Amino acid sequence: MGLQGQLSDVSSDSIPLMLLSLLAVFINHLRSFLLRLTSKSNPNLPVDDVSIASGLANIIVLADQLSLNRLFSYRCGDGGGGGSDCVVCLSKLKEGEEVRKLECRHVFHKKCLEGWLHQFNFTCPLCRSALVSDDCVSKTQRSVGRDLISCFSLH
């Protein structure tokens, strides 16, 4: 009858999308319920938005630095750095190895610098000069904080 005609109009691709949207609505309601429940049971429980925003901002800065590491790395011998030591792994930089020269002019193995960055060290491993300005990090933190507030604000 009328119901069968309507079901045949629904594409099989749209059914998973409808289920996904229903799941998203359910999760949103569950999150709202749990937030109300926890705020009633412990009103002194602080929500540390600053540390969440700071952590996410660090991840964004890390992604930017890893991207720069890929873009600005080169083979040793192409742009200098041969014969010196990588202070991260304490090995000699050999011709043909992938290296990266920082703004402070220090050269490291690309993989060693990636490992350094993965520990959220945004300074030169040798002289500790900043790879990212404090202003850039605080801008990213403010931007992430604003995005978090708009994304997770209760309606």
UniProtKB/Swiss-Prot annotation:
Zn finger limits (RING-type):
86-128
Name of the featured protein: E3 ubiquitin-protein ligase RHA2A
Localization, UniProt = Cytoplasm; Nucleus
Q: Tell me, what is an example of a GO biological process annotation in this record?
A: positive regulation of abscisic acid-activated signaling pathway
State the tissue distribution.
Answer: Expressed in stems, flowers, cauline leaves, rosettes, siliques, seeds and roots.
Record bears the keyword Acyltransferase:
no
Q: Which reaction does it catalyse?
A: S-ubiquitinyl-[E2 ubiquitin-conjugating enzyme]-L-cysteine + [acceptor protein]-L-lysine = [E2 ubiquitin-conjugating enzyme]-L-cysteine + N(6)-ubiquitinyl-[acceptor protein]-L-lysine
* The protein's role, per its UniProt record: E3 ubiquitin-protein ligase involved in the positive regulation of abscisic acid (ABA) signaling and responses to salt and osmotic stresses during seed germination and early seedling development. Acts additively with RHA2B in regulating ABA signaling and drought response. Possesses E3 ubiquitin ligase activity in vitro.
Whom does it interact with, and what assembly results? Interacts with NAC019 and NAC055.
What does the record give as its pathway?
A: Protein modification; protein ubiquitination
The UniProt disruption phenotype note reads: Decreased sensitivity to ABA and salt and osmotic stresses during seed germination and early seedling development.
- EC? 2.3.2.27
GO terms under cellular component: cytoplasm; nucleus
- Which GO terms fall under molecular function for this chain's record? ubiquitin-protein transferase activity; zinc ion binding
Q: Name where it mostly resides.
A: cytoplasm
Q: Which UniProt keywords apply?
A: Abscisic acid signaling pathway, Cytoplasm, Metal-binding, Nucleus, Stress response, Transferase, Ubl conjugation pathway, Zinc, Zinc-finger
SUPFAM superfamilies hit by this protein: RING/U-box (SSF57850)
What is the organism field in this record? Arabidopsis thaliana
What class does this enzyme belong to in the EC scheme? transferase
What does its UniProt record remark on the domains?
The ring domain is sufficient for the interaction with ANAC. Presence of both a nuclear localization sequence (NLS) and a nuclear export sequence (NES).
